[in-house]
Amino acid sequence: MRKNRKYIFWIGIITFLFVGYFILDGMLFDGIKPIVVNKHGFQANYFVKNSVEQKAAIVLIGGGQWGDYWGQEFARKGFVGLSLPYRGKEGLPKLPEEINLEYFKDALEWLKAQPTVDPSKIIVMGASRNAELSLVIASIFPELITGVVAYAPSSVSWSNTVLAYNSNDLKPSWKYQGVDIPYVPMEKIVGNNSKTIETLQYWKDGLAKTDYVPQATIKVEQINGPILLFSGKEDKVWPSSLMADRIEQRIKASNFPHAFLNIKYEKAGHLISSHPEINSSSRTGNMTIMGKDYEYEFGGTIEGDKKAKQAAKIKLLEFIEKI
């Protein structure tokens, strides 16, 4: 009898803790929890409020903490967010090279069919290399996408070898229907005898490869909707403001029929592309080249990045409201 009472006691305690966890979790968590999607040919976290109203949807290319933050923010503002990783998880490629764009097409077609999504208002958004990818995706699938937001963008597609941790063999970063997306071929960045490395000139040298840049330039004029670019004028990782200006030049030359904004911030660096609620005091990142660790500069200032990210968030929400 005592033994049964003991079991009942512990079952009661476990039940109390289990129920209490969910009650407390609901009280403390005021965000919107994602619906995990792991079928239909892609993996993603889907953020949406319960509603019968169709809303604009934003696809966060690259997913991760950054994508989940924005997915939740957009859902809280009355939109839909899809945080979409494409590498580094089980079932996905390990490295960002030879990434098949059909993966994103599957996600976009699924998203477009959701009852809470307005199929005429689907935006892709990315930061840094994922800004490059967002622009590429939007230029190839104009029938599925009606807007792009790119933080610290690129005007061209690059080879896989721009990333030190990728394979050494020259490959495209992106492919579609078995065909390489044209790219600027780059040797891997070379280390030195110090503990720091400068990356900005590496990318500028790539942009000077006139034999490759014309065909590698992203065909932004094919994008079927407004484009919003953000960059920091003091970006020391890569020349994002310069590349944003090149995108603008191509847009102007094509008589682009949609809205276009190229917003550049003073005293801001590459971290304008980072999580907007995290203001890191670190001004350098880490890179491993041939087994040796180096530091590289992000550029900008702590205050400059903070102000830029706050201002950009306001502009971003205004942009989406207008689509």
Question: Which residue ranges define each predicted feature?
Answer:
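Conserved alpha/beta-hydrolase
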Residues: K77-L92
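Alpha/beta-hydrolase active-site loop
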Residues: L95-P115, V136
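Short beta-strand/loop motif that positions the catalytic acidic residue
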Residues: I223, L229-S231, D235
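Alpha/beta-hydrolase fold nucleophile elbow
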Residues: T116-S128
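Hydrolase active-site cap/lid region
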Residues: I137-K204
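N-terminal cap/lid segment of alpha/beta-hydrolase-fold proteins
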Residues: L17-E53
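C-terminal catalytic histidine-bearing segment of alpha/beta-hydrolase fold enzymes
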Residues: D245, P257-I323
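Short beta-strand element of the alpha/beta-hydrolase
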Residues: Q54-G63
